[in-house]
Amino acid sequence: MVEGVAFGMSGLRLWALLVTVASVGGLVVYFGYGGWLYWRYYVRRRDRAVDWKIQPRRFQPADKHRWGIRVAAVNMLLGGLLSGSFAYYVVGGGYSALYLDAAEHGLAYTLLSVVLLFVAIEASAYYTHRLLHRKWLFKHFHRWHHRCVAPTPFNTVTMHPVEFLMLQVSAFLPIFVLPVHAYVFIGMLVYVLIFNIMDHSGIVMRHLLPWHSTSRFHDDHHVYFHCNFGQNLGWFDRFHGTLRRKDRRYGEKVFGGKGAPVGDERGATPEFVEY
Ligand SMILES: [Zn+2]
Ligand SMILES: [Zn+2]
């Protein structure tokens, strides 16, 4: 194989190497950063939960905690398998809009592409997530992720493997049309994973990057179910009116993303929650 010759190894060995690197890298970020947050707050400051926890009175029972970690580990390995295989496909000359030489599109475009990719991945995640909240998909797949009403850092990818595959594909779709440097894409995947871990941490966090919603934005998604579908940003929820409203009722059975009216709303201005 051409790519095998280029790296001085057989195709199978190259594939195995890429899958191993992607899997180990993913597991190290996930359990390294997630584990550190868990130890720092859930272990060391458990008795002072009111000071740091978004839902200070809610902790997962031990069996659900262990189940969440097992499912997440399987999904991270699945993610490594997919990402490594995708890298092998690209190295072998498979089609994508990724490029390796920054001079090919210029430095200015490469910098702009960071923003474009971020918004494209966010859009992809928002619409996929909204789709997962349709009754059938929610009941059969997305319900797994919503078993964690008070999520911990380990629950970021505690989800049905079918859902994990859907989200993984949705994150990869933009790079088939948007030219992006390969390192920008890899960096973006790590960035999104780290912020996702913070957003599932259950810890009160106000991100230093001003475009990010606070960690309460996604934590509320787990409490109220069908609202706040965005991943890092509240933009798409604001645009579609799916941001949580103080004046509406939400719950597992209230589908549609806009809650249910509590009383007569005639003439009333919607009261959206600030995150
Ligand atoms: Zn959801
Ligand atoms: Zn979640």
Residue ranges and their predicted role:
Residues L112, V119, W136, A150, ...:
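Residue-level detector of transmembrane insertion/anchoring sites
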Residues M1-Y127, L131, H140-R143, C148-V169, ...:
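Non-catalytic, topology-defining segments of multipass membrane proteins
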Residues S124-A150, D199, I203-V204, H212-H226:
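Acidic (Asp/Glu-rich) catalytic motifs at the cytosolic membrane interface
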Residues G106, L137-F138, V180-A182:
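Short acidic/polar alpha-helix capping motifs at helix-coil junctions
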Residues L178-F239:
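Functionally important transmembrane alpha-helices
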